[in-house]
Curated annotation (Swiss-Prot):
Residues 249-333 are annotated as: Alpha C-terminal domain (alpha-CTD). Homodimer. The RNAP catalytic core consists of 2 alpha, 1 beta, 1 beta' and 1 omega subunit. When a sigma factor is associated with the core the holoenzyme is formed, which can initiate transcription. HAMAP family: RNApol_bact_RpoA (MF_00059). It catalyses: RNA(n) + a ribonucleoside 5'-triphosphate = RNA(n+1) + diphosphate. GO terms for molecular function: DNA binding; DNA-directed RNA polymerase activity; protein dimerization activity. GO terms for cellular component: cytoplasm; DNA-directed RNA polymerase complex. Coiled coil: none annotated. GO terms for biological process: DNA-templated transcription. DNA-dependent RNA polymerase catalyzes the transcription of DNA into RNA using the four ribonucleoside triphosphates as substrates. Its EC number is 2.7.7.6. It comes from the Bacteria. Belongs to the RNA polymerase alpha chain family. This is DNA-directed RNA polymerase subunit alpha. It comes from Chromohalobacter salexigens (strain ATCC BAA-138 / DSM 3043 / CIP 106854 / NCIMB 13768 / 1H11).
Length: 333
Protein backbone atom coordinates (compact mmCIF):
# COMPACT_ATOMS: atom_id res chain seq x y z
CA UNK A 1 0.00 0.00 0.00
CA UNK A 2 1.49 3.34 -1.07
CA UNK A 3 1.54 6.14 1.47
CA UNK A 4 1.83 9.88 0.99
CA UNK A 5 5.39 11.18 1.32
CA UNK A 6 4.14 13.71 3.89
CA UNK A 7 2.33 11.13 6.03
CA UNK A 8 4.19 9.95 9.12
CA UNK A 9 4.05 6.39 10.33
CA UNK A 10 2.65 5.92 13.83
CA UNK A 11 3.43 2.98 16.14
CA UNK A 12 0.88 0.22 15.66
CA UNK A 13 2.70 -2.65 17.36
CA UNK A 14 3.08 -2.23 21.13
CA UNK A 15 4.45 -5.03 23.31
CA UNK A 16 4.95 -5.09 27.08
CA UNK A 17 7.34 -7.67 28.49
CA UNK A 18 6.96 -7.97 32.26
CA UNK A 19 10.24 -9.05 33.83
CA UNK A 20 8.77 -8.72 37.34
CA UNK A 21 6.17 -6.58 39.09
CA UNK A 22 8.45 -3.53 39.08
CA UNK A 23 10.45 -4.12 35.90
CA UNK A 24 9.21 -4.15 32.32
CA UNK A 25 10.32 -3.62 28.74
CA UNK A 26 8.01 -1.69 26.43
CA UNK A 27 8.53 -2.08 22.69
CA UNK A 28 6.90 0.27 20.17
CA UNK A 29 7.22 0.18 16.39
CA UNK A 30 7.39 1.44 13.72
CA UNK A 31 8.65 5.01 13.95
CA UNK A 32 9.97 7.12 11.13
CA UNK A 33 13.75 7.17 11.04
CA UNK A 34 15.13 9.31 13.89
CA UNK A 35 11.90 9.45 15.88
CA UNK A 36 12.97 6.53 18.07
CA UNK A 37 15.80 8.60 19.58
CA UNK A 38 13.73 11.81 19.62
CA UNK A 39 10.88 10.32 21.65
CA UNK A 40 12.96 7.81 23.60
CA UNK A 41 15.26 10.49 25.00
CA UNK A 42 12.36 12.83 25.84
CA UNK A 43 10.44 10.11 27.70
CA UNK A 44 13.57 8.93 29.51
CA UNK A 45 14.32 12.44 30.81
CA UNK A 46 10.73 12.92 32.00
CA UNK A 47 10.68 9.51 33.69
CA UNK A 48 13.86 10.27 35.61
CA UNK A 49 13.23 13.88 36.58
CA UNK A 50 9.54 14.74 36.51
CA UNK A 51 7.48 11.86 37.90
CA UNK A 52 5.65 12.69 41.14
CA UNK A 53 5.99 10.43 44.16
CA UNK A 54 6.44 10.29 47.95
CA UNK A 55 9.56 10.21 50.10
CA UNK A 56 10.70 10.41 53.73
CA UNK A 57 12.11 13.92 54.16
CA UNK A 58 12.49 14.19 57.94
CA UNK A 59 13.15 11.83 60.84
CA UNK A 60 12.94 12.50 64.56
CA UNK A 61 14.63 9.69 66.50
CA UNK A 62 14.16 9.48 70.26
CA UNK A 63 17.38 10.33 72.08
CA UNK A 64 19.16 11.61 68.96
CA UNK A 65 20.08 15.28 68.50
CA UNK A 66 22.13 15.08 65.29
CA UNK A 67 23.00 12.63 62.52
CA UNK A 68 26.51 11.95 63.84
CA UNK A 69 25.17 10.07 66.85
CA UNK A 70 25.16 6.41 67.78
CA UNK A 71 22.24 4.69 69.52
CA UNK A 72 22.95 2.19 72.28
CA UNK A 73 21.85 -1.30 71.29
CA UNK A 74 21.52 -0.45 67.60
CA UNK A 75 24.04 -1.92 65.16
CA UNK A 76 23.81 0.93 62.65
CA UNK A 77 24.78 4.51 63.39
CA UNK A 78 22.30 7.30 62.71
CA UNK A 79 23.69 8.13 59.26
CA UNK A 80 23.21 4.51 58.14
CA UNK A 81 19.64 4.54 59.48
CA UNK A 82 18.88 7.73 57.54
CA UNK A 83 20.31 6.23 54.35
CA UNK A 84 18.10 3.18 54.83
CA UNK A 85 15.05 5.40 55.38
CA UNK A 86 15.64 7.07 52.01
CA UNK A 87 14.92 3.73 50.31
CA UNK A 88 11.56 3.17 52.02
CA UNK A 89 8.94 3.13 49.25
CA UNK A 90 5.81 4.93 50.46
CA UNK A 91 2.55 5.36 48.56
CA UNK A 92 -0.14 7.83 49.66
CA UNK A 93 -3.57 7.03 48.21
CA UNK A 94 -5.44 10.10 49.47
CA UNK A 95 -5.20 13.78 48.62
CA UNK A 96 -2.82 14.67 51.43
CA UNK A 97 0.55 16.14 50.51
CA UNK A 98 2.27 15.12 53.74
CA UNK A 99 1.86 12.70 56.63
CA UNK A 100 3.75 11.86 59.84
CA UNK A 101 4.29 8.16 60.57
CA UNK A 102 5.62 6.45 63.70
CA UNK A 103 7.97 3.52 64.23
CA UNK A 104 8.64 1.78 67.56
CA UNK A 105 10.59 -1.48 67.97
CA UNK A 106 12.45 -3.27 70.76
CA UNK A 107 15.28 -5.77 70.39
CA UNK A 108 16.52 -8.24 69.75
CA UNK A 109 15.07 -7.85 66.26
CA UNK A 110 15.48 -6.52 62.75
CA UNK A 111 13.68 -3.24 62.11
CA UNK A 112 12.05 -3.19 58.68
CA UNK A 113 9.85 -0.77 56.76
CA UNK A 114 6.91 -3.00 57.64
CA UNK A 115 7.27 -1.94 61.29
CA UNK A 116 6.21 1.61 60.41
CA UNK A 117 2.68 2.30 61.64
CA UNK A 118 0.66 3.69 58.73
CA UNK A 119 -2.71 5.37 58.26
CA UNK A 120 -5.49 3.82 56.18
CA UNK A 121 -4.48 5.79 53.08
CA UNK A 122 -0.74 5.14 53.33
CA UNK A 123 1.02 2.01 52.06
CA UNK A 124 4.58 0.75 52.56
CA UNK A 125 5.38 -1.02 49.29
CA UNK A 126 8.66 -2.65 50.41
CA UNK A 127 7.87 -3.84 53.98
CA UNK A 128 10.90 -6.18 54.04
CA UNK A 129 13.38 -3.34 53.51
CA UNK A 130 15.81 -3.33 56.47
CA UNK A 131 16.20 -0.11 58.44
CA UNK A 132 18.28 -1.25 61.44
CA UNK A 133 19.33 -4.21 63.61
CA UNK A 134 18.68 -4.19 67.38
CA UNK A 135 20.41 -6.30 70.03
CA UNK A 136 18.91 -7.40 73.36
CA UNK A 137 19.03 -3.91 74.87
CA UNK A 138 18.24 -2.03 71.68
CA UNK A 139 15.17 0.12 71.21
CA UNK A 140 14.29 2.39 68.30
CA UNK A 141 11.53 4.98 68.33
CA UNK A 142 11.09 7.59 65.64
CA UNK A 143 8.66 9.77 63.75
CA UNK A 144 8.94 10.08 59.99
CA UNK A 145 7.62 12.91 57.86
CA UNK A 146 6.58 11.78 54.38
CA UNK A 147 5.70 14.33 51.71
CA UNK A 148 4.59 14.24 48.11
CA UNK A 149 6.90 15.86 45.59
CA UNK A 150 8.65 15.60 42.26
CA UNK A 151 12.22 15.03 41.17
CA UNK A 152 15.08 15.41 43.66
CA UNK A 153 15.18 17.79 46.63
CA UNK A 154 18.41 18.17 48.66
CA UNK A 155 17.96 18.49 52.41
CA UNK A 156 19.90 21.76 52.59
CA UNK A 157 17.44 23.60 50.32
CA UNK A 158 14.55 22.53 52.51
CA UNK A 159 16.42 23.31 55.73
CA UNK A 160 17.12 26.89 54.65
CA UNK A 161 13.39 27.50 54.28
CA UNK A 162 12.50 26.08 57.70
CA UNK A 163 15.53 26.93 59.86
CA UNK A 164 13.60 29.18 62.20
CA UNK A 165 10.89 26.65 62.95
CA UNK A 166 12.80 23.36 62.84
CA UNK A 167 13.32 21.86 66.28
CA UNK A 168 16.61 20.33 67.37
CA UNK A 169 16.65 16.62 66.61
CA UNK A 170 14.60 16.76 63.41
CA UNK A 171 17.00 15.22 60.92
CA UNK A 172 16.59 16.21 57.27
CA UNK A 173 16.98 13.73 54.40
CA UNK A 174 17.72 14.29 50.73
CA UNK A 175 14.51 13.27 48.98
CA UNK A 176 14.20 11.37 45.71
CA UNK A 177 10.50 11.56 44.95
CA UNK A 178 10.57 9.84 41.56
CA UNK A 179 9.20 6.28 41.71
CA UNK A 180 11.39 5.42 38.71
CA UNK A 181 14.64 3.82 39.83
CA UNK A 182 16.18 3.06 36.45
CA UNK A 183 15.26 3.69 32.82
CA UNK A 184 17.11 3.26 29.55
CA UNK A 185 16.12 3.05 25.93
CA UNK A 186 17.52 1.60 22.75
CA UNK A 187 16.59 1.93 19.09
CA UNK A 188 16.71 -0.95 16.64
CA UNK A 189 15.85 -1.28 12.97
CA UNK A 190 12.23 -1.97 12.05
CA UNK A 191 10.59 -2.96 8.78
CA UNK A 192 7.21 -2.27 7.22
CA UNK A 193 6.61 -3.90 3.84
CA UNK A 194 9.54 -2.78 1.68
CA UNK A 195 10.77 -0.05 4.02
CA UNK A 196 13.74 -1.02 6.18
CA UNK A 197 14.85 2.42 7.39
CA UNK A 198 12.39 2.60 10.30
CA UNK A 199 12.93 2.65 14.09
CA UNK A 200 11.87 0.29 16.86
CA UNK A 201 11.92 1.90 20.32
CA UNK A 202 12.64 -0.30 23.36
CA UNK A 203 12.25 1.25 26.82
CA UNK A 204 13.64 -0.69 29.80
CA UNK A 205 12.01 0.63 32.97
CA UNK A 206 12.24 -0.26 36.66
CA UNK A 207 10.27 1.41 39.48
CA UNK A 208 10.29 1.20 43.28
CA UNK A 209 6.89 -0.53 43.30
CA UNK A 210 4.77 2.52 44.11
CA UNK A 211 3.99 2.93 40.41
CA UNK A 212 3.43 0.30 37.74
CA UNK A 213 5.97 0.56 34.85
CA UNK A 214 3.19 0.78 32.25
CA UNK A 215 1.47 3.55 34.21
CA UNK A 216 4.81 5.38 34.47
CA UNK A 217 5.12 5.35 30.68
CA UNK A 218 1.55 6.63 30.30
CA UNK A 219 2.12 9.46 32.78
CA UNK A 220 5.40 10.53 31.19
CA UNK A 221 3.76 10.56 27.74
CA UNK A 222 0.89 12.64 29.14
CA UNK A 223 3.34 15.16 30.61
CA UNK A 224 5.14 15.41 27.27
CA UNK A 225 1.85 15.81 25.41
CA UNK A 226 0.68 18.57 27.76
CA UNK A 227 3.95 20.47 27.38
CA UNK A 228 3.86 20.25 23.58
CA UNK A 229 0.20 21.28 23.41
CA UNK A 230 1.22 24.93 23.81
CA UNK A 231 2.97 24.77 20.43
CA UNK A 232 -0.06 23.37 18.62
CA UNK A 233 -2.12 26.55 18.86
CA UNK A 234 0.07 29.53 19.65
CA UNK A 235 -2.91 31.89 19.27
CA UNK A 236 -5.18 30.09 21.75
CA UNK A 237 -7.86 32.19 23.38
CA UNK A 238 -6.44 32.85 26.86
CA UNK A 239 -9.73 34.17 28.18
CA UNK A 240 -11.36 30.82 27.47
CA UNK A 241 -8.54 29.06 29.34
CA UNK A 242 -9.10 31.27 32.39
CA UNK A 243 -12.82 30.46 32.40
CA UNK A 244 -12.10 26.73 32.23
CA UNK A 245 -9.63 27.00 35.12
CA UNK A 246 -12.15 28.82 37.29
CA UNK A 247 -14.81 26.22 36.54
CA UNK A 248 -12.53 23.56 38.04
CA UNK A 249 -12.06 25.41 41.35
CA UNK A 250 -14.23 24.25 44.25
CA UNK A 251 -16.69 27.09 45.02
CA UNK A 252 -15.99 26.79 48.77
CA UNK A 253 -12.42 27.97 48.13
CA UNK A 254 -13.74 31.24 46.69
CA UNK A 255 -15.62 32.08 49.88
CA UNK A 256 -14.14 34.60 52.36
CA UNK A 257 -12.54 33.31 55.56
CA UNK A 258 -15.29 35.13 57.49
CA UNK A 259 -17.61 32.29 56.42
CA UNK A 260 -15.56 29.93 58.61
CA UNK A 261 -16.93 31.76 61.67
CA UNK A 262 -13.57 31.85 63.43
CA UNK A 263 -13.00 33.78 66.63
CA UNK A 264 -12.30 37.48 66.18
CA UNK A 265 -8.66 36.98 67.20
CA UNK A 266 -8.03 34.27 64.61
CA UNK A 267 -9.89 36.14 61.85
CA UNK A 268 -7.93 39.35 62.48
CA UNK A 269 -4.62 37.47 62.45
CA UNK A 270 -5.44 35.97 59.04
CA UNK A 271 -6.49 39.29 57.54
CA UNK A 272 -3.27 40.86 58.82
CA UNK A 273 -1.45 38.30 56.66
CA UNK A 274 -3.63 39.13 53.61
CA UNK A 275 -5.50 35.83 53.88
CA UNK A 276 -8.98 36.80 52.72
CA UNK A 277 -10.30 33.63 51.05
CA UNK A 278 -10.47 29.99 52.11
CA UNK A 279 -8.35 29.13 49.07
CA UNK A 280 -5.63 31.45 50.40
CA UNK A 281 -5.79 29.83 53.83
CA UNK A 282 -5.51 26.14 52.92
CA UNK A 283 -2.29 26.76 50.99
CA UNK A 284 -0.54 27.98 54.15
CA UNK A 285 1.30 25.42 56.27
CA UNK A 286 1.16 25.15 60.06
CA UNK A 287 4.70 26.50 60.25
CA UNK A 288 3.78 29.57 58.21
CA UNK A 289 0.69 30.32 60.30
CA UNK A 290 2.57 29.98 63.58
CA UNK A 291 4.88 32.75 62.39
CA UNK A 292 1.86 35.08 62.25
CA UNK A 293 1.93 37.62 65.11
CA UNK A 294 -0.59 36.85 67.90
CA UNK A 295 -1.62 33.53 66.35
CA UNK A 296 -0.78 30.70 68.73
CA UNK A 297 -1.39 26.97 68.99
CA UNK A 298 -4.96 27.45 70.21
CA UNK A 299 -5.91 29.56 67.20
CA UNK A 300 -4.09 27.15 64.89
CA UNK A 301 -6.03 24.17 66.26
CA UNK A 302 -9.28 26.11 65.84
CA UNK A 303 -8.46 26.79 62.18
CA UNK A 304 -7.52 23.15 61.56
CA UNK A 305 -10.74 21.87 63.15
CA UNK A 306 -12.93 24.27 61.14
CA UNK A 307 -11.22 23.27 57.89
CA UNK A 308 -11.42 19.55 58.72
CA UNK A 309 -15.18 19.87 59.21
CA UNK A 310 -15.35 20.99 55.57
CA UNK A 311 -13.04 18.27 54.26
CA UNK A 312 -10.08 20.65 53.95
CA UNK A 313 -6.66 20.95 55.59
CA UNK A 314 -3.63 23.19 55.73
CA UNK A 315 -0.72 22.69 53.34
CA UNK A 316 -2.86 21.83 50.31
CA UNK A 317 -1.72 22.76 46.82
CA UNK A 318 -3.91 24.63 44.35
CA UNK A 319 -3.10 25.14 40.72
CA UNK A 320 -4.22 28.32 38.93
CA UNK A 321 -4.74 30.17 42.21
CA UNK A 322 -5.86 32.86 42.62
CA UNK A 323 -8.32 32.85 39.70
CA UNK A 324 -8.59 35.99 37.61
CA UNK A 325 -11.88 37.02 39.24
CA UNK A 326 -10.27 37.14 42.70
CA UNK A 327 -7.25 39.01 41.36
CA UNK A 328 -9.60 41.67 40.00
CA UNK A 329 -11.47 41.88 43.33
CA UNK A 330 -8.24 42.30 45.31
CA UNK A 331 -6.96 44.92 42.87
CA UNK A 332 -10.15 46.96 43.14
CA UNK A 333 -10.06 46.66 46.94
Amino acid sequence: MQRSVTEFLRPRDIKVEEINANHAKIVLEPFERGFGHTLGNALRRILLSSMPGCAVVEAEIEGVLHEYSAIEGVQEDVIEILLNLKDVAVKMHGNRDEVVLALSKQGPSVVTAGDIAVDHDVEIVNPDHVIAHLNDSGELKMQLKVVRGRGYEPADTRASEEDESRAIGRLQLDATFSPVRRVSYSVEAARVEQRTDLDKLIIDLETDGTLDPEEAIRRSATILQEQLAAFVDLEADKEQEVEEEEDQIDPILLRPVDDLELTVRSANCLKAENIYYIGDLIQRTEVELLKTPNLGKKSLNEIKDVLAARGLSLGMRLENWPPASLKDDKASA
